[in-house]
Amino acid sequence: MSKDMNVNEKIRAREVRLIDSNGDQLGVKSRQEALDIATTRNLDLVLVAPNAKPPVCRIMDYGKYRFEQQKKEKEARKKQKVINVKEVRFTPGIGDHDFETKLKNARKFLEKGDKVKAAVRFRGRAITHKELGREVLDRFAEEVKDLGTIETKPKMEGRNMFMMVAPINEKN
């Protein structure tokens, strides 16, 4: 919502197309005539389309209108879901128990609606065995396929191989 809407005397146009509070068009009127109509109804004259020829003004209760707009904005902010990206790190030769523990954490993240970045970190000479890292990520993808979908396939970036998994309910 624009904070600086022109209301009543702040409207500079000489002629305006007037719409009443019910949405009915009252035609093209002079600014003063439109202001007089608004004041007799104890309402405000609000410029809603300044770029139209002639500009469009509406007769309404401006305070109530601003309150409604603020309420709508607040509701829209509440409905926005912030999606976090959680990272789970593996090594190419990870043990079964360690893998299960990290898998359990990743499943929790996906259930909460967060994206999961699964990364395999290669240290030292392990970088020569990239296929081991791919096997770990493939196994991870297989284990979480009921909760998430693969957003990016496994790829190398520096000494890390990673993939992104998004929760399934986000796609629907």
Swiss-Prot record:
One of its GO terms (molecular function) is ribosome binding. Gene3D superfamilies: Translation initiation factor 3 (IF-3), C-terminal domain, Translation initiation factor 3 (IF-3), N-terminal domain. Signal peptide: none annotated. Its main location: cytoplasm. PROSITE patterns: IF3. It is found in: Cytoplasm. InterPro entries: T_IF-3_C_sf (IPR036788), T_IF-3_N_sf (IPR036787), Translation_initiation_fac3_CS (IPR019813), Translation_initiation_fac_3 (IPR001288), Translation_initiation_fac_3_C (IPR019815), Translation_initiation_fac_3_N (IPR019814). GO terms for cellular component: cytosol; membrane. Pfam families: IF3_C (PF00707), IF3_N (PF05198). Keywords: Cytoplasm, Initiation factor, Protein biosynthesis. It comes from the Bacteria. GO terms for biological process: ribosome disassembly. IF-3 binds to the 30S ribosomal subunit and shifts the equilibrium between 70S ribosomes and their 50S and 30S subunits in favor of the free subunits, thus enhancing the availability of 30S subunits on which protein synthesis initiation begins. Monomer. Belongs to the IF-3 family. This is Translation initiation factor IF-3. It comes from Oceanobacillus iheyensis (strain DSM 14371 / CIP 107618 / JCM 11309 / KCTC 3954 / HTE831). The lineage of its organism: Bacteria, Bacillati, Bacillota, Bacilli, Bacillales. The gene is infC.
